[in-house]
Amino acid sequence: DGAKAYTRFKANEIDLNRDAQDLSQPESVALSTFFNKFKPDFCFNLHGQRTIFSAGNINKPATVSFLAPAQDEACTVTDNRKIAMTIIVKMNKNLQLQIPKQVGIYDDAFNINCVGDTFQSYNVPTVLFEAGHFEGDYNREVVREYIFQSLLIAIHCIASNQLDGEGYEDYFKIPENEKRFYDIIIRNAKLKLDNKEQILDIAIQYQETLVDNAL
């Protein structure tokens, strides 16, 4: 029902990405059961990201963002996080050739209720992907290509055993996401407020909804 309504909240208002510990929903139980049965060596955590984010203090959108989720309150750089960071560094190198300065790092504040943080806490290298915004690409068709490329690079790194934890330090050179954008800004609009005419900028933020199964 969450997908049908274009939200990760279910009809009962439960956010599945905050249910990794409580396991109150059948979907959460199914994922946890499969994780414990399959015992993955790596986990990929895929998200969509709103249009408001930049990659650092720059006038460009964050087209793709990554995160090696924290696994404790101290955000300790554990061995499995180093491996996740190394994967991100390799993906970022490819993307910088195509969308320079449009790759960011998402906030790594620890929340054990999130699926990615939970999987990382089990000492499994976990990489979070955020499909962000490319100018004019509200259906994320361009972004989809960059996510696909990144997945291929990540899988190649794993399959070719290129992950010894070396080079993870470059992860910290990737700028963090900042909230810097609106979808539309109307400049120098004349408004009458409190019987006084004022010139203001008006910012508009889109709300993504499905209409006839289209975004």
Question: Where do the PLM segments sit?
Answer:
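C-terminal accessory segments enriched in acidic
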Residues: F38, D72-C75, A84-L215
